[in-house]
Amino acid sequence: MAMDTGRDSSALTDLLGRLQPADAEAMARARERQAQLTKPAGALGDLEELSVRLAGVFGTERPEPRGAAVLVAAGDHGVAAEGVSAYPPEVTPAMVANFLADTPAGPGGAAVSALARTLGAEVYVMDAGVNADLPEHPALTRAARRRGTRNLRREAAMTREETVALMLAGAALADRAMDAGADFIIPGEMGIGNTTPAAALTARLLGVDPADVTGRGTGVDDERLAHKVDVVREALARTAVTDPLDVLAEFGGFEIAAMLGMMLAAAARRRAVILDGFVEGSAALVGVALAPALRDFLFPAGECAERGHAAQLADLGLKPMFNLGLRLGEGTGGVLALPLLRGAAATLREMRTFEEAAVPGGGAA
């Protein structure tokens, strides 16, 4: 697919320029309302801060977020040839087929498919750069510029132009979902080997040793984990780039770039972005480096089991909602967080104040 690099660069600049911080006045009104609701102060724990943050995203002290969409971007990685995963690259196209499969329960036979059906989210699937001939399917968005990234151990995974193009493709898919009614955007991914680029991105952006942020991914043993750390270390030694877009191009992946575009588009339109795990976290680090206001729109679902995720969340200054030991990806954790965020918004919107309910003791601890 041909790229108009000048137009793409201009479109990205425009997208970044549209991001504004959360509505501080709406958050102040939400905090004031929280203090008047029929409950002891702080009794709803972290739900209270989540509700205030949602007020800032949606610009009202009574947020009413509706639809949710999981946007699963799939891509292959040249670095998989280094043996950094417990699974072969052929799993990526097979899982794309699984996302699109017709099953007795409905569309999709993957974990994210089942969870999305159960918890009320639409699933969108994007070919961001799968190394296979994928069959035609009406539910598949085709955005691939090439079949998999280059091997980041030896060369840049993507060109800067490819990176920007995939970011814009992700933004376009998010726009589609939002136009269809999604107020929660949940980026998800599928790509064998993608915790390796995520580790490289995290190590460079946080300035930490690769061993501290490189985990087992699909479940590699100790020997292969040590090799994976070496691969990340050698990749980082290739170049000293620090510009966020250059870092993403050097060490990232097509699906990571696409997820970043989804996040930026959602924030630009003042929607909530639910972060799943480590790979999504690496995209978020790049995004906040590019546009600090993005942070206000990010809601980490849970701290995943992958080493390095806690460091990402600490750098972002964001608290996860749960810790279930998840490390699957696909957006699964993000979908599981939906009821918590919907519930948090409902407390602001639907609870009565002490005065409204004629309950004595307003403001008491």
UniProtKB/Swiss-Prot annotation:
GO biological process terms on file: cobalamin biosynthetic process
Reaction(s) this enzyme catalyzes, per UniProt: 5,6-dimethylbenzimidazole + nicotinate beta-D-ribonucleotide = alpha-ribazole 5'-phosphate + nicotinate + H(+)
Keyword Cytoplasm annotated: no
Domain of life according to the entry: Bacteria
Alphabetical list of Gene3D superfamilies matching this protein: 1.10.1610.10, 3.40.50.10210
A molecular function GO annotation: nicotinate-nucleotide-dimethylbenzimidazole phosphoribosyltransferase activity
Enzymatic class: transferase
Active site: E330 (proton acceptor)
UniProt entry keywords in alphabetical sequence: Cobalamin biosynthesis, Glycosyltransferase, Transferase
Pathway assigned in UniProt: Nucleoside biosynthesis; alpha-ribazole biosynthesis; alpha-ribazole from 5,6-dimethylbenzimidazole: step 1/2
Documented EC number(s): 2.4.2.21
Keyword Glycosyltransferase annotated: yes
Family as reported in the entry's similarity comment: Belongs to the CobT family.
HAMAP family: CobT
Role, per record: Catalyzes the synthesis of alpha-ribazole-5'-phosphate from nicotinate mononucleotide (NAMN) and 5,6-dimethylbenzimidazole (DMB).
Protein name, as recorded: Nicotinate-nucleotide--dimethylbenzimidazole phosphoribosyltransferase
Organism: Deinococcus radiodurans (strain ATCC 13939 / DSM 20539 / JCM 16871 / CCUG 27074 / LMG 4051 / NBRC 15346 / NCIMB 9279 / VKM B-1422 / R1)
Record gene name: cobT
